[in-house]
Every structure is written in C-alpha cells, then in structure tokens.
From Swiss-Prot:
Source taxon at top rank: Bacteria
Keywords: Hydrolase, Iron, Manganese, Metal-binding, Protease, Zinc
Positions contributing to a divalent metal cation 2 binding: H40, D49, E166
Binding partners and assembly: Homooctamer.
Name by which UniProt lists this protein: Mycofactocin precursor peptide peptidase
Species annotation: Mycobacterium ulcerans (strain Agy99)
KW Iron (keyword) present: yes
Length: 250
C-alpha cells in the first residue's frame, strides 16, 4: 500500500471508517467517488480517475460540512467505486472495464441499498465513459423516489485523456506517482474530430501511447487551480440541488 497516496487521498473515507451503530441517528448524505481502472499513458497510474474523484469528493465533503446548520445531517465520503466503463481503452494492458450495462446495474443497486439509511446520494464521477451508466442509474433512482444526483470532475477547456489537465491535477494531489521522465505529447486534435476513429478502434486507433492532449505542459500550480475549479463546481451544484432529467446536478 502506498502510504503517501493514502495520506493524500484516503481510499476509505468517513463512511468506510464509521460503524453501523453511528449511522441510524444521523441520516447522513454521502458522496460516492466513481472512477475507473484504465491506462493513462506511460506516465500516470491506472487509478488516475479514481484518485481524482476521491480527492474531489474529500474536498467537497469538507466544504459541505462548513455549510451545515445544527439541524442538518452531515456528509460522508464513501469508499470509491474503482471500476467503470472503459472499453475504449481495452487495447492497453491494465485496463479493466465492466461495461456500461454492468456499471448501470451496480450503481442502481448501490443507490437502492444506500438510500435505506442515507439522505442524499451524490456520485462524483471522474471518468467520462461512465456517463451513460450514471444517467440510466440515477434517473431510475430518482423515479423510484430516492434523492440521488451526480456531478462530474470537470474543468473548462480541459484536454481529453492523460494530457495537461489530468497530469496537472495528479502533480497537485499525488506528485509521487507521476513519472515525469516519461511525459510525451499525444494526439491533441479536438475530441469531436477523433470520435469516429475512437468509436471504431478505441483510443489506440488515434494515440498509440494512450494520451489525448499534451502532458508535457502540466504543472502542480496549474493542477491546484484546476482541482479548485472542480471542487467549487461540485459544491455549487450540490448547494443548488437541481438535478436535471438525467440526474446530473445543474
């Protein structure tokens, strides 16, 4: 176990270290980081999306605690869901994808179970490939009367995969796992231009190294800014609590 990583981004958050007897009287809301296990080029770890979602969730939980009144329930960070729909990366070793349908069912059953004792559920998503499953699961949970929503770890103008954006954030939250001697620019074409080839052959069809963007420009300072933007956006969406038709917090 990488102790430095776990000091920065605990895999077990407050929910994981709580006891069952502590929960019935609190009726907490929970933040569930949702990531993936997939290639992130030659320089970032397979759990990059999970690290980011967990770090954002941790920071959001802290911020939400500061907004509570005495009569409001608290927010707990759940242990992350570290597997998602990553079929576009399947050509690369290390990728483990459970597919959109399996993920949808997992999230649906997770939400049904957690809603038995939790107030609100927020999935904090760190991987774009999970969106289809999230939409289907959270839409169903809300149709069943459960107060669920989801938010993405997004940044305006960010590149697509293992490039400047994700590498900068990792340099901020987990610098020890970034292999800076292996940084190499990938395909930086706009995602819209790449989509036809991506759909046919996955990421390997457009980037042999698995990078979409340019990680060579990444810095920890930029990562701090991007990370703060992700946290601010998620906090604002939760505070407004206006889920759209697909359950995404707007």
């Amino acid at each position: 176990m990488n102790s430095s990583y776990h000091r920065r981004v605990p895999v077990l958050g407050e929910l994981g270290t709580s006891t069952s007897s502590q929960l019935p009287s609190t009726w907490p809301s929970i933040l569930i980081p949702l990531g993936s296990t997939e290639q992130h080029g030659p320089h970032l770890p397979l759990d990059t999306d999970t690290r980011i979602a967990t770090a954002v969730g941790r920071a959001v939980a802290t911020r939400m605690h500061g907004r509570l009144t005495q009569c409001q329930p608290g927010w707990l960070l759940a242990p992350p869901i570290a597997y998602g729909a990553s079929g576009e990366h399947q050509s690369f070793a290390g990728t483990i994808s459970i597919g959109a349908e399996a993920l949808r069912v997992l999230l649906l059953e997770y939400g049904r179970s957690a809603a038995c004792w939790a107030d609100r559920l927020v999935f904090v998503n760190g991987h774009g490939g999970n969106v289809e499953a999230l939409r289907g699961a959270v839409r169903q949970l809300r149709a069943e009367g459960r107060d669920a929503g989801w938010s993405a770890c997004g940044s305006a103008g960010g590149d697509a995969h293992a490039g400047h954006t994700e590498t900068s954030v990792l340099l901020h939250i987990s610098p020890e796992v970034v292999l800076t001697d292996r940084l190499s620019a990938g395909n930086a074409a706009p995602l819209a231009e790449l989509l036809p080839s991506l759909r046919r052959g996955g990421v390997a069809a457009v980037s042999p190294i698995g990078v979409l963007g340019d990680p060579t420009t990444a810095t920890a300072v930029e990562g701090r800014r991007i990370f703060a933007e992700m946290v601010d956006d998620c906090v604002s969406r939760i505070a407004r609590w206006t889920p759209g038709p697909d359950g995404m917090l707007t």
